[in-house]
């Protein structure tokens, strides 16, 4: 780590952390060591920013469990939201014409895909092992995008 002008290490002010394979283990849970490290950093005044490909409500659930109150970067960076009130601080939408084209490709190719409209994330999947009743809040299974 670099040092400042006075030779001291600069104080860490922000840690951005991914969920899958970083904060969450293979079982999609947070280890005790990771939870303690995040809580210690929050207690020391460090801003913890979750940055993930996942949708907001899943990232928020993790933030809430750890006491993280900094904005959440989610949806592969296309959305930044406040975990406190859900306010959208940044939202990058795919233009309608391109979204329709992408949906048609996913439907025709029978690809698994997700699309978020408002606060609902739609999961296009044909996998028989997906139980719609067990999907996280804010996610619905669909047969077409």
Where do the PLM segments sit?
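Anionic-ligand binding region
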Residues: 137-145
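Asp-based phosphoryl-transfer active-site loop
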Residues: 11-28, 102
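Active-site phosphate-binding/coordination module
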Residues: 32-136
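Residues at structural and domain junctions
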Residues: 7, 24-27, 45, 88
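Extreme N-terminus of proteins, especially the signal/transit-peptide cleavage junction
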Residues: 1-13
């Amino acid at each position: 780590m670099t040092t400042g002008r006075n030779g001291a290490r600069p104080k860490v002010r922000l840690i951005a952390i991914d969920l899958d394979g970083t904060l969450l283990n293979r079982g999609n849970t947070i280890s005790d060591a990771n939870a303690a490290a995040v809580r210690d950093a929050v207690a020391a005044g460090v801003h913890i920013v979750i940055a993930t490909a996942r949708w907001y409500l899943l990232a928020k659930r993790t933030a809430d469990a750890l006491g993280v109150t900094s904005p959440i970067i989610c949806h592969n960076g296309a959305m930044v939201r406040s975990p406190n009130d859900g306010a959208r601080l940044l939202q990058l939408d795919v233009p309608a014409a391109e979204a329709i084209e992408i949906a048609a490709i996913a439907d025709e190719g029978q690809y698994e895909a997700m699309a978020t409209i408002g606060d609902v994330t739609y999961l296009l999947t044909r996998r028989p092992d997906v139980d719609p009743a067990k999907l996280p809040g804010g996610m619905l299974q669909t047969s077409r995008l």
